[in-house]
Design a protein with these regions (language model features):
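Non-catalytic architectural context of zinc metalloproteases
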Residues: 1-5, 42-44, 71
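Acidic-and-aromatic substrate-binding clefts and catalytic sites of carbohydrate-active enzymes
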Residues: 63-64, 90, 100
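Charge-rich, low-complexity N-terminal segments
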Residues: 1-23
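Active-site scaffold of zinc-dependent metalloenzymes
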Residues: 25-68, 81
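Post-HExxH zinc-binding segment in Zn-dependent metallohydrolases
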Residues: 93-117
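Active-site recognition of the HExxH zinc-binding catalytic motif
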Residues: 72-84
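Short helix/strand-bridging catalytic loops that position acidic/His residues to coordinate divalent metals
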Residues: 85-92
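Short, conserved micro-motifs enriched in small and acidic residues
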Residues: 68-69, 73, 94-98
Length: 117
C-alpha cells in the first residue's frame, strides 16, 4: 500500500463552511456545528477519491469563551480528526505516536489560523 492522502481543512464560520461545501460539490451538507457544540468535525469521502476532514468552529457561539477554553475545544476536535485519520488509514489501534503527531499538527494548524502566532 502506498501513501494515503487525507485532506484537512478548517472552517471558522458558517459562511466559510457553506463556501467550502459549494466548492466541494456537496449539495446537502450536514449542519455547520450542532447547537451548543461550539465545534465539530465533518468527514467527506467520494468513491474513488481521498477523504476530506473539516474541523468547523463557531466563533460566534464561543465569543464568551477564554482562549484557554477555545484551545481546549480545538484540542478535543483535533483528537477526533486523528481518530478519523487512523481509521481511514487502517492504522493499528495502538498507533499512539501517529495519533499524537496528527493531533499536534491539526492543533497547531487550527490555532495558527485562529490566533496567528
Amino acid at each position: 500500500m502506498g501513501p494515503i492522502i487525507v485532506h484537512f481543512g478548517f472552517c471558522g464560520s458558517e459562511k466559510a463552511y457553506r463556501k467550502t461545501m459549494k466548492r466541494m460539490g456537496v449539495s446537502d451538507p450536514m449542519p455547520f456545528v450542532p447547537p451548543g457544540a461550539g465545534a465539530s468535525v465533518r468527514t467527506f469521502e467520494k468513491p474513488g477519491s481521498n477523504m476530506t476532514i473539516l474541523m468547523c468552529y463557531d466563533a460566534e457561539s464561543e465569543s464568551g469563551s477564554t482562549r484557554n477554553q477555545i484551545d481546549s475545544l480545538i484540542a478535543h476536535e483535533a483528537a477526533h480528526v486523528a481518530q478519523y485519520c487512523l481509521e481511514y488509514m487502517r492504522e493499528k489501534p495502538d498507533a499512539h505516536e501517529t495519533f499524537a503527531y496528527i493531533v499536534q499538527y491539526v492543533f497547531g494548524f487550527v490555532t495558527n489560523e485562529l490566533w496567528g502566532d
